[in-house]
A protein has these predicted regions:
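Serine endopeptidase catalytic core focused on the charge-relay Asp
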Residues: 83-117, 121-124, 128-132, 136-250, ...
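Low-complexity, proline/glycine-enriched flexible segments
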Residues: 153, 256, 360-366, 425
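C-terminal cap/linker of serine protease catalytic domains
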Residues: 1-12, 16, 20-24, 195-199, ...
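N-terminal accessory interaction module
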Residues: 364-397, 404-407
Length: 427
């Protein structure tokens, strides 16, 4: 099985963009990502609005050359939410809600068992639910309906807080109900059998709207590298270029696994990971992270990568929408294109800090995955407050919890998006 995907085509695209990418990297180093050519004024405005900030206020600060002190007191967080500080690289602090939401998102990500006609395992890939009955992965993972019919997807294959593997759920694929794929976009969309346990996984909407990501932001990947228990690469892949169909993101340590969802910091899916640009020696052989010549038995997670490539979600949705389907499959597609994920039940909390004082405590959702966190990440936790919850939904008639996201009331000036993370700042 070609576990590495279309590397040659990815490498060619990457080399063709050397000059543009170096220009982008220069702007990123100077913390001037709003000047990057791919970040057009309209896209920047859409991104700012999606973060529930005031675009006129933010852009006026940019034009006036005002610097920010994100630790200072004072201005309205609606004008400059902390999420936007991270976009502009002025604040790397992440609230604990970010990790709780990441755990809940991860439920929809599964390990694909790729099997031969005799039932033997050929390899593994990653896939994720994009509706209650549809799974998205790479075409090089499931190249045909016949291959999909032999394969299965396993959810909840991950370690718990004590390091033990949790009980997982194996689900059959149902390509006879729906199977779509495309070689250029390297995606396969396949129906899954209607198992009762799927409801607990939820699903991740494919949002066609613009404004989910700017060049210069970091992205997060949830994956099963080489078939291993579920892992998260958090904020250690930086988007360095945007093409018509793809985005390129660089990392020093974290590869992506074929078929993995790529997320922004609001846990919206922005790309389908499918390939990368590996390091090579003078003989054009692939190298491992410790400098050896790579062999396929080592698994793709051992390759030393220069960059990763993901297929843009907006292009995937556009292609899926345009394909001819038999009438019986149309309801499945319409759920993907238009339905909203139902609210996910919170998993039972686990006490991590010993017996708390009355009214105090710290909880996280059960079902812990492995985090891959860069050393620069600083997390500040206060144990003096109430147990953590998803912000801003209980008792608030103006907000609605949908899957992982808090949906704000629609308005003419701002699109629906993940709830803002408030933060004070000072001019």
């Amino acid at each position: 099985m070609p576990i590495l995907g279309p590397i040659s085509a990815t490498e060619a695209r990457y080399r063709q963009r050397d000059e543009m990418r170096e220009s982008n990297l220069g702007a990123i180093r100077r913390r001037e990502i709003l000047t990057i050519a791919a970040n057009t004024p309209e896209l920047v405005r859409q991104r700012i609005e999606r973060l529930h900030a005031d675009p006129d206020f933010v852009l006026s600060l940019k034009h006036n050359g005002v610097a920010f002190d994100p630790q200072g007191p004072g201005r309205c967080p609606q004008q400059f939410p902390r999420a936007l500080e991270r976009v502009l690289a002025t604040n790397d602090l992440m609230g604990m809600r970010f990790f709780e939401q990441g755990l809940r998102v991860s439920r929809a990500v599964g390990r694909i068992h790729i099997r031969d006609s005799g039932g033997g395992t050929l390899g593994y890939g990653t896939g994720f639910l994009v509706s209650s009955r549809l799974l998205l992965t790479n075409q090089h993972v499931l190249p045909s309906a016949a291959a999909a019919s032999r394969s299965t997807v396993e959810f909840n294959y991950q370690e718990n807080a004590s390091g033990a593997i949790q009980a997982s759920t194996m689900v059959s694929l149902a390509p006879q109900e729906l199977f779509l794929s495309d070689e250029q976009l390297d995606y396969a969309l396949v129906a899954v059998a209607p198992e009762p346990g799927l409801a607990a996984c939820g699903w991740l909407p494919l949002i066609e709207d613009q404004g989910k990501l700017l060049v210069g932001e970091t992205v997060n990947i949830i994956q099963h590298p080489n078939g291993e228990p579920k892992q998260l690469a958090i904020r250690n892949n930086q988007v360095v270029d945007e093409l018509e169909l793809f985005i390129h993101y660089q990392t020093d340590t974290d590869p992506g696994s074929s078929g993995s969802p790529v997320f922004n910091d609001q846990w919206e899916v922005v790309a389908l990971h499918h390939s990368g640009v590996p390091k090579r020696n003078p003989a054009n052989e692939l190298l491992t992270t410790d400098g050896r010549v790579w062999q396929e038995w080592m698994g793709e997670q051992r390759i030393a990568w220069l960059a990763n490539e993901g297929v843009r979600v907006s292009r995937l949705v556009r292609h899926i929408r345009a394909q001819a389907l038999p009438p019986a499959a149309e309801p499945l597609r319409q759920e993907l294109l238009g339905a909203t994920p139902p609210p996910l039940a919170r998993a039972p909390a686990t006490n991590l800090v010993g017996p708390p004082a009355a009214g105090e405590g710290l909880t996280v959702a059960a079902g812990t995955a492995t985090y891959t966190i860069p050393l620069q990440l600083n997390v500040s936790v206060s144990l003096g407050g109430a147990a953590g919850t998803v912000a801003g939904v209980a008792g608030d008639p103006q907000q609605e919890l949908l899957g992982l996201f808090v949906r704000q009331p629609a308005s003419a000036s701002a699109p629906t998006a993940a709830a803002a993370v408030p933060a004070a700042f000072r001019l």
